[in-house]
């Protein structure tokens, strides 16, 4: 059976959060409470106390000040729910700017719904569709992540992805294929490249790391 999982940001308004969940029009089987400040812990405990008598509740503290670092943390948590076939809903009723933006990006990447309470009603906020990344490009992103986020040459990346460099004729095909994929990844903002002498260094961007967290 599909479970409905609510990812709820918590800042300082327990009553609004609880009301928004009740008014969302969706069932709730599990909740993740996310927060990013010491001051919010009190309200996290209050919301947890209310919801835990009804559903399973987990808490996720976002410890970074960066938006994409927060997105990676959220997606690593959300991914297991999506992979299990569950429906994920983001509730940004009580969000500061960073958490709100991180939730919006996470909802977009994971193709989840996002809602908020506005006055006496709850509204769903549409997110634009995100461009799909094929398996060949995902494997490049995974390889960069395994290497700590960067490699110092295309040859190194080919070795990581394909296992070895082929002889001259096949090698040229390998290099052309890798260059083609890297151009697409760079256009999508998932990697950046930098020429260093004869070599081309490749770096995973923060958005690229978020894709690996969700799809890698």
UniProtKB/Swiss-Prot annotation:
<dbReference type="Pfam" id="PF19810">
    <property type="entry name" value="HFX_2341_N"/>
</dbReference>
<protein>
    <recommendedName>
        <fullName>Uncharacterized protein AF_1987</fullName>
    </recommendedName>
</protein>
<dbReference type="InterPro" id="IPR046260">
    <property type="entry name" value="HFX_2341-like_N"/>
</dbReference>
<dbReference type="Pfam" id="PF22665">
    <property type="entry name" value="DUF6293_C"/>
</dbReference>
<dbReference type="InterPro" id="IPR036388">
    <property type="entry name" value="WH-like_DNA-bd_sf"/>
</dbReference>
<dbReference type="InterPro" id="IPR054162">
    <property type="entry name" value="DUF6293_C"/>
</dbReference>
<dbReference type="InterPro" id="IPR036390">
    <property type="entry name" value="WH_DNA-bd_sf"/>
</dbReference>
